[in-house]
Amino acid sequence: MYAIAFDLEISELKKHYGDPYNNAYFEVKSELEKIGFEWTQGSVYLSKDPRNNLATVYKAINLLSNIDWFKHSVRDIRAFKVEDWSDFTEIVKTS
């Protein structure tokens, strides 16, 4: 499984996206879901592609590169392979 994580500069996002700037995150989520990514937390998205290859990551990077406000606002963007994805939420909430 592959993931994408990014960080946006809020001052640049306000300048290039406008207000309410937080809608930009919903827009990214919607676009990435269309190509097989699932939002997990913050600005981290996991690929749901069963083929488990970098082609889906490439599609996502290409898609985000074509969003004008995104490319002007992104501070950092990374893609990485996830070997294991363990959800400890229930343990923490019921402790």
From Swiss-Prot:
InterPro entries: VapD, Virulence_VapD/CRISPR_Cas2. The keyword Secreted does not apply. The keyword Hydrolase applies. GO terms for molecular function: nuclease activity; RNA binding. Homodimer. Cleaves ssRNA, mostly between U:A. Belongs to the VapD ribonuclease family. This is Endoribonuclease VapD homolog.
